[in-house]
């Protein structure tokens, strides 16, 4: 049991730590959207939101590849226990299957916050957390219709919770339109738009990460 707890903690720390980079970039995308909406530059705000969504998909794919490649080396720095590390890899690899979903959810969270829809953001995240909490014991121990999946069940519960959060954002986006429009016509990469997102987001992320 102790090994399972340690493996869960190690895998969770790794995936959560790497998602911080995406969260900070999305945060400053939020700032830019709010800034350009306030400046009455609707097209630029739409471009930042749409291209931010596309970048979040790319970030999710990159996180999956880089985290999968570096997971074992990272875990060895936390524990020399082979059993713990193998279970942590099981957890981490399954959570990483949902990387794109997680990065999209983070981006939508910041888009809704940028237009003042804080209640939607809070509601979506709470629903995702509650689903995760509810599914954890069911999928870990095999309660009800679920088979006992152990550490894999915890990972899948996390992924399903994140998927639910993203779906709720999408429902709100289409059911109650917000000032920012995510449309294909804004998807064409604009060097100036993308450079603004990274120029603000990356230094801020490094600034927050270096002291720790």
Task: Write out the residue ranges for each language-model feature.
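Membrane-embedded alpha-helical bundles of multi-pass transporters/translocases
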Residues: 1-39, 43, 82
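Short alpha-helical transmembrane segments in multi-pass integral membrane proteins
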Residues: 1-8, 40-100, 146-202
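Alpha-helical transmembrane segments and their helix-entry boundary regions
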Residues: 15, 118-122, 151-155
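Hydrophobic/aromatic residues within transmembrane alpha-helices of membrane transport systems
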Residues: 17, 21, 33-38, 43-45, ...
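Alpha-helical transmembrane segments of multipass membrane proteins
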Residues: 18, 22, 26, 59, ...
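Hydrophobic/aromatic residues in alpha-helical transmembrane segments
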Residues: 29, 33, 70-71, 108, ...
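Alpha-helical transmembrane segments of multi-pass membrane transporters
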Residues: 67, 120-149, 163-169
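Membrane-interface junctions at transmembrane-helix termini in multi-pass inner-membrane proteins
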Residues: 101-125
